[in-house]
Amino acid sequence: MENSEDVFNDDYEHPENVEYILESVLMPSDGSSEFNLLAEDYNSILLNQCRCNETTCENIETCTHGGQYEFKPQQKELTLKKLENTARPIIECNDLCGCSKNSCLNRLVQYGPRRNLEIFHSTRYRSHGLRTKVHIPSGAFICEYAGELLTVTEAKKRLENNHTLGLMNYVLVLNEYSNEKKQQVTIVDPSRRGNIGRYLNHSCNPNCYIGAVRIDCPIPKLGIFAARDIEAQEELCFHYGGEDQSKNINEGKACLCAAANCTGFMPNTSIE
Ligand SMILES: C[S@@+](CC[C@H](N)C(=O)[O-])C[C@H]1O[C@@H](n2cnc3c(N)ncnc32)[C@H](O)[C@@H]1O
Ligand SMILES: [Zn+2]
Ligand SMILES: [Zn+2]
Ligand SMILES: [Zn+2]
């Protein structure tokens, strides 16, 4: 299995002057109560360990976390089973779980981005993009979208600033719902500090999508997964509109994705 080493592995670098971070970090404190709540969540540990004992944690019937990933021997790696419901949380096993790290089939994002990714100049998008040097199977984990974790107030300020100054926008807002009710919003900005995930462009017909992945913290990681088989040299893209792709279209900047179903506009990043 490609990701079977139980160590975090990420030796990518930025082509420009941005601080490389391996996973999301808190924004600088602004002293607000909103920041304090975010910091409290960031510093909390999820006490939801599974009680499996040396089993594979594959089976949703027996493992309280399992069931989202599957190991297909022909692909030689864990892949995400269900592609339809991206808002569904994915919970990985962690150090508190009863299972063995070596045999657990519910640990993927925690080992870091896949290898053979490459930052390049995308002529289509006239800026940086991310592509793969080798084939990627459907459902495979690409990388986290890691950056500074923002409060809603700080995110609104940064969005306004990006808009006013005509800067590229890296702020990503992930809403999670349960029974159609919004449960949690996670906002990540890799503009100043981030990982390789910041280079994926938007497409109206993307080959990747974002899922919320929890490991040992109530704040999810934004995991980028392959939405289909992806060929070597293909640029990796996801839909910036997130869970509701019909919203916020026809409002943003002109879209350069060139997909047959392109709406002509990039979705605006909005915070409800
Ligand atoms: C998260 S960054 C993606 C990486 C970026 N291209 C770079 O050079 O660092 C998002 C920015 O890339 C550009 N971009 C991404 N997708 C685009 C699209 N479909 N059409 C036009 N510009 C896009 C926009 O400037 C957007 O604000
Ligand atoms: Zn388990
Ligand atoms: Zn496990
Ligand atoms: Zn488009």
Please provide the spans of the model-predicted regions.
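C-terminal SET catalytic tail plus cysteine-rich post-SET Zn-binding segment of SAM-dependent SET-domain
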Residues: 2-3, 15, 77, 152-184, ...
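Short beta-strand element of the conserved SAM-dependent methyltransferase core
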Residues: 52, 130-132, 223-225
